[in-house]
Amino acid sequence: RRQRQMSIRDRMEAVGQALAHLDEFRTQEGAILIADLLKRIDRIEAYKQEVIPFEKARTEAIRARIRESLAQLQTEVDNNRLEQEMIFYIEKLDITEEKVRLTNHCNYFREVAASEECAGRKLGFIAQEMGREINTMGSKANNSEIQILVVKMKDELEKIKEQVLNIL
């Protein structure tokens, strides 16, 4: 009987050690996962920065296309009215707001990932909002170089969404 009690105690101790090792492993795995997620957030922001040089050229190309189309019509145009219409059209295609919101979402993602209560669901919701901004940028872009960068952002975001499912 004495030996049996010792055996139970040994078993309890072994289970306790196993649980401690499991907890340590999960903590290490979580740190690696968060580091990977943050690296992907950095990539998304880097791709967003790469969009900037294409924006001015895109706007100028739109203006040139409109002027060229009008020249082909060979009609007199009120230049003030033309400028107003071009500004209106170009503003509809402006992606500044989306870039600002994407930056805010990336910062919030980092903040939540660094917090003690890092919640996978919350990170998932933030990633979903990031996706909306990236998609809107893509639909407004009307530029192949920007589209390529948007696809790269989407690729990173998909990997983030998959990994976030592994966070409790």
Q: Which positions does each model-derived feature cover?
A:
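Amphipathic, non-membrane alpha-helical segments in soluble helical-bundle scaffolds
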Residues: 9-12, 31-41, 52, 56, ...
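Amphipathic, well-ordered alpha-helical segments in soluble domains
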Residues: 14-18, 40-43, 47, 105, ...
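Long, charge-dense, solvent-exposed interaction surfaces that engage phosphate-rich ligands
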Residues: 18-72
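Long, amphipathic alpha-helical coiled-coil segments characteristic
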Residues: 32, 83-118
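C-terminal non-catalytic interaction appendages of large macromolecular assemblies
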Residues: 102, 106-168
